[in-house]
Design a protein with these regions (language model features):
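Non-heme Fe(II)/2-oxoglutarate
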Residues: 1-84, 89
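Catalytic core of non-heme Fe(II) oxygenases with the double-stranded beta-helix
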Residues: 76-170
Length: 170
């Protein structure tokens, strides 16, 4: 059966990495240098560290493929660590630039709070809210589904995530 490219999907897996790999990734992301990221309106999304293309050969990239898209030919466009502490307003958006067709989001480090998680819109209304739990991996087509952190909705704290955007190779 062929993949329907119009399908909207959000899926997640808890306890995605083994403990040693998660700890190593937590140590890495908390010691990176981050740069501000703003949307086209000048609003601050948060802080980002973009990894170089060499990370595409990391075993983590292969693990993501095994779990989420073993039968699709997706290739990372960008791999970055994000630090968010957004207590002002949700900044819903789609990630449809550079040919992006899918997003991977790993909740790396932060408090296990519902509002530290990510929300998804359907018909411009919040329809799904996936709370933050360390080592929770999300995979969704962020070019089709508007999404945002929901830290401004209530109790939240800073959160570190690993974000990967994918393009599809035919």
């Amino acid at each position: 059966m062929q993949h329907n490219k119009k399908t909207k999907f959000v899926m997640y897996v808890d306890d995605f990495l083994d403990e040693a790999t998660l700890k190593s990734l937590q140590d890495t992301v908390t010691n990176l240098e981050y740069q501000e990221v703003k949307n086209p309106n000048g609003q601050l999304y948060g802080m980002r560290h973009t990894f170089d293309k060499g990370i595409n050969n990391d075993p983590l990239i292969k693990l993501i493929k095994q779990y989420f898209f073993p039968h699709r030919n997706l290739e990372p466009i960008s791999v970055s660590a994000h630090l968010r502490e957004n207590n002002k307003e949700p900044l819903f958006h789609t990630d449809d630039d550079k040919g992006n067709v899918a997003n991977f989001l790993l909740f790396v480090k932060g408090e296990p709070l519902l509002n530290n998680g990510t929300g998804f819109l359907h018909n411009e209304k919040l329809s799904s809210h996936i709370g933050f739990i360390e080592n929770r991996a999300l995979f969704f087509n962020g070019s089709k589904i508007s999404h945002s952190d929901l830290q401004s909705f209530g109790d939240s704290s800073k959160r570190y995530t690993l974000n990967i955007f994918y393009k599809e190779n035919d």
